[in-house]
């Protein structure tokens, strides 16, 4: 009983977005084996976001597996108001994503997979540019890489043993 309540709470806590569903085949002696691969991003729109992949013979099962994987792979995004603290360049494989903070009210200027990650992370004002590979998994991983590089001014000041006013 307690297990069911925990699952209900987790489902309501995170919002999911399916970024891509890919039909993949494995050629075997008897022919082709068809399966589906799903890429899902989950987030609470309050600074926590994660992604996961799942593979199964049916699409709903692949999505369920991807959601489970995404919930185990969450990161925390430091934010300044509704935007990012500074620019970041995330790289994964051939995909590069440039993330830039934007003024309040600018909205999310990003496409496809990048938009899904940023919106579910709760970033409301940001500009992004996709450079290189536009494969959804590379783009999502590069975006998450860029978000993990972000640090608030307070964190940088603490690391350097200075006060925040020294950076101004």
UniProtKB/Swiss-Prot annotation:
GO terms for biological process: translation. GO terms for molecular function: rRNA binding; structural constituent of ribosome. Gene3D superfamilies: 3.30.160.20, 3.30.230.10. Residues 14-77 form the S5 DRBM domain. Keywords: Ribonucleoprotein, Ribosomal protein, RNA-binding, rRNA-binding. It comes from the Bacteria. GO terms for cellular component: small ribosomal subunit. Transmembrane segments: none annotated. With S4 and S12 plays an important role in translational accuracy. Located at the back of the 30S subunit body where it stabilizes the conformation of the head with respect to the body. The N-terminal domain interacts with the head of the 30S subunit; the C-terminal domain interacts with the body and contacts protein S4. The interaction surface between S4 and S5 is involved in control of translational fidelity. Belongs to the universal ribosomal protein uS5 family. Part of the 30S ribosomal subunit. Contacts proteins S4 and S8. This is Small ribosomal subunit protein uS5. The lineage of its organism: Bacteria, Bacillati, Bacillota, Bacilli, Lactobacillales.
């Amino acid at each position: 009983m307690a297990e069911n309540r925990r699952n209900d709470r987790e489902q309501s806590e995170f919002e999911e977005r399916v970024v891509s569903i890919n039909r993949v085949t494995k050629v075997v002696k008897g022919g082709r084996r068809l399966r589906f691969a799903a890429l899902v991003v989950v987030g609470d729109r309050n600074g926590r976001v994660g992604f996961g992949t799942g593979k199964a013979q049916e699409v709903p099962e692949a999505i369920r597996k991807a959601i489970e994987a995404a919930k185990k792979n969450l990161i925390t995004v430091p934010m300044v108001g509704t935007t990012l603290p500074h620019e970041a360049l995330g790289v994964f494989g051939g995909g590069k994503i440039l993330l830039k903070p934007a003024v309040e009210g600018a909205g999310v200027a990003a496409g496809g997979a990048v938009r899904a990650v940023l919106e579910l992370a709760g970033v409301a004002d940001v500009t992004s540019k996709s450079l290189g590979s536009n494969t959804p998994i590379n783009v999502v991983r590069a975006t998450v890489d860029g978000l993990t590089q972000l640090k608030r001014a307070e964190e940088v000041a603490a690391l350097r043993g200075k006060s925040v006013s020294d950076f101004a």
